Amino acid sequence: MEQIITGEGQIVPDLDEHITRSGIDQAGTDYHMVSIIGCQSSGKSTLLNLLFGTKFETMNEQKGRQQTTKGIHAARAVNGPILLFDVEGSDSRERGDSDALFERKSSLFALALSELLVINMWESDIGRYNAANIPMLKTVMEVNVQLFLAQSTSKSKILFVIRDSTIPNFDVIKFQINRDMENIWAEITLPDSLKDKTIHDFFDFDFYAIHHMVIQRDIFDKDISALRQRFIDEKEENYLFKEKSTKVVPGGGLSTYIRNLWEVINENKELNIPSQKLMLSRFKCEENAKAAYDQFKEKVTKTILEPMADESVNLGDKFKSNAEEAIKAANKFYHDNSWRYQQAAVEEFQQKLSTDIGDLLISYYIKHCNYYARQVMQEFTKFISGLPDSFEKGGKWAIEVQAKIDELSLRLDSTCRDSLIEGYKWQFPSFKTIKAMDDARKSYEEIMTKKLYKNIFAEEKIAFDDKASELLMIADQNMWENLRKLIEASAKVTDDRFMEIIKTNVLNPKPQEGTLKRFQRHALNIVKESANYIMMKMKTAFDRSFRYEKNGRPRVWTRRHNLNQIYEESRASGRKVLILFTYCRLASPDDQTPNNPLNQVLIPVEKSQEIEEKFEKLIIHAYEEARASVLASQNNEHIPPWAWFLFLFSCSDYILWWLSNPLLFSLTVLFGGTYLVLNQLGLWDTAVQKLLDIIKKKIVELGATPDENNETETNQTIPVEESQITPPPPTETTTDDGPVMKRRVHRSKAQGLTKTESNVTFANVSNANDEQSLTKNNTEDSLNTGSSSSGQRHRKRVRVGTLV
């Protein structure tokens, strides 16, 4: 037993917990509510305990008659889903006339809430005014009329339980009570619309007599048992709950309903009760709408949601038919269970039900449409993947792709409209799929654009490298201007080739930015790398002027050549190369940008001076070699003619014998012709050196004799500085286009040298060293043929020693 309303008229704070403990909150609408009213100490609580097994507090007879139940108490019957309300007794000494309003409020509460109102009366009090609760019954009738007027409620059912009955003819008791009720009804002022109504249009009266509990205990127990059956046995002829009352509200909202009802009654001293029918309708319609929604949710879960859990399954037309079937069933359930309530409440919760169904179903609808969206995306991906992976000249890649996007978008919109549920104006966000396809197009377009530009730039960079290397190899006065023109031309060709292809394949073609800067950075790296080999470039420029004629043939030194002038001009050619590479001038002369990396020092002053000193040491050997050749040529030219005549006359016999021998004659012609040709070409010394190299190699293979070893040690070559013959190591730099690979000395296009020129350079260095040794060991005044021959033999020994 729990108190729900205190004696002071306040709702208990834990009302929700009381209802929950009773279990009524889980009963839905499958329960009944019964209230009992009557005079104080008339045995109301005892009657409820005996009928339903409850434990309402009863009067202690040892303390005498006094108020036991204060306020309103509630408990659930043990033998059935019946919620019982034990109302504080009327006509109590404790309250007196000071607070008769509470009795009226509690009576109103019991009548408005309960399906069945039990009035507990003593048989001996029938016919009296206060003892028979005539004032309270009058209040009940007035309140019932107000409820009827406000909401056209059904009849209120009242059960009169007559206690301590002794009259054999119970009909007399019924007659007396009915007479009193009609008298009370006659005293009530009815509105014009109800003046033709009788009391029986508003109330159903039922009567039951119970014998004395103490004197007639056995009969009393039988009376209680019989009355209990009328409450719990649905098959009982006089079952009290045959008709479903509209006063029952869903158990889950009962506590809220009780609280709201009591607040209205308690705050309105004039008992201006609001529309209880509307309140009841709202509760009932809400319950029905919830049940209909649950039914709908369960059905669509089985027919739509579970099959759609597998993304590969497509319901097709079944989605729409299954959804509409579930909606129809839910609406029918709601209408069948709610049509009897007020139309305003029915329509309100019908709209709420439709909204709830729509809120649930739209997620399924979007999921269903997403299947078609995935199909569209798969088809688009397959289509775009099947196109060429690179732009073609004159192609229309973007136009073809955009046409496919438009086609798939229209198909998706049409499919989603066909799946739309009747009564709902949903719109599938197909723009997301369209955006996804457009993003994919842009992604492919960006990748292919970068690929196209990268390929064109790479091709043009190769051509640029060849031309730039040639310019760096020539290293003339116009080198920097030509490099700048080459950079601009290469950038323009790259951009033109790129735009020619891109303009027909992209909707909004835009030129790539930074092409000129990319070529400038790349050219700067090539120039820096080429500057590392400045010594070789200077030597190449010197040799090109000093060792070769203007027609490109090797120069054979004679006394007719102006050696000093040629040497100075050749040395100046080498120094010009150093000056060219000292400072980078890739930037335009009009570009005055401070700290421009295109205008930077390549070779510092200190390094430049060091290089120039090494260059002077390196080329002096070529000068000495040429000077020696001139001197030798002069000696050969000064042999007097008579000496040649005397030589031929004295050796005529030997010459004739030599010429008469075919073998010797052939060998003489062969070797003589070879010598003349090689000597004319200036390659005789080279041929002799090559022959000595082969001989020395054979000697090394067979093993040298001690004498040869001593000769080798004696004839060591004069040391040459390593920096004069060994090029600096290649460097590795990084550009926007990737690392510049290390390049070997013999790669001509990076350093401006050909392989042949490089080899000639090293040969010249060796020859120069040999001539230095020759100069140190022979005086300048030894200009005869013998000294020249001796120098040549000594030079041969030096070279053989060098090879060891």
Curated annotation (Swiss-Prot):
Protein name from the UniProt record: Protein SEY1 homolog 1
Keyword GTP-binding recorded: yes
Stored InterPro entries: G_GB1_RHD3_dom (IPR030386), P-loop_NTPase (IPR027417), RHD3/Sey1 (IPR008803), Sey1/RHD3-like_3HB (IPR046758)
Keyword Transmembrane set for record: yes
Location (main, coarse): endoplasmic reticulum
Family: Belongs to the TRAFAC class dynamin-like GTPase superfamily. GB1/RHD3 GTPase family. RHD3 subfamily.
Lipid bilayer topology: Multi-pass membrane protein
GB1/RHD3-type G domain ranges (all copies): 28-245
Basic residues compositional bias, start-end: 792-804
UniProt enzyme class: hydrolase
Transmembrane residue ranges: 639-659, 663-683
Ranges annotated as biased composition (Polar residues): 751-791
Lineage, broadest ranks: Eukaryota, Metamonada, Parabasalia, Trichomonadida, Trichomonadidae
Subcellular location: Endoplasmic reticulum membrane
E.C. numbers: 3.6.5.-
A single cellular component GO annotation: endoplasmic reticulum membrane
Pfam families in the record: RHD3_GTPase, Sey1_3HB
UniProt region (Disordered), positions on chain: 706-804
Segments on the Lumenal side according to the record's topology features: 660-662
